[in-house]
């Protein structure tokens, strides 16, 4: 699993926990639906930290809370 995969999975998990759709999340966060769809569908292999921060703000969580998930602890180190 890559970091981008983990971010995608975490966003989906957070939406499921809060029972909101990706469309609703985009509205709450003030980002475009296409940006969120690109992240979700793998079109964005390197989501910007600023975008992740907007998602966190919309969900009323910190970046630390976003990344404090088992998903990120299991990542293999990416070397490019």
Predicted regions and their residues:
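Short, charged recognition helix plus adjacent turn
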Residues: 1, 38, 45, 67-80
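A short, Lys/Arg-rich alpha-helix, primarily the initiator
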Residues: 1-20
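Residues within the helices of the helix-turn-helix
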Residues: 12, 23, 53
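Residues in the recognition helix of alpha-helical DNA-binding motifs
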Residues: 14, 28, 39, 69
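The alpha-helix within a helix-turn-helix
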Residues: 15, 26, 56
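Short alpha-helical DNA-recognition segment
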Residues: 19-38
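Short, basic-rich loop-to-helix N-cap that marks the start of a DNA-contacting helix
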Residues: 43-57
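Intrinsically disordered, low-complexity basic tails/linkers immediately adjacent to helix-turn-helix/homeobox/MYB/SANT
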Residues: 57-65
């Amino acid at each position: 699993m890559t970091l981008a995969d983990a971010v995608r999975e975490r966003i989906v998990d957070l939406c499921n926990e809060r029972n909101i759709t990706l469309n609703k999340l985009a509205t709450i966060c003030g980002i475009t639906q296409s940006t969120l769809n690109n992240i979700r569908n793998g079109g964005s292999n390197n989501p910007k930290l600023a975008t992740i921060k907007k998602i966190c703000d919309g969900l009323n969580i910190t970046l630390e809370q976003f990344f404090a998930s088992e998903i990120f602890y299991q990542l293999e180190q990416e070397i490019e």
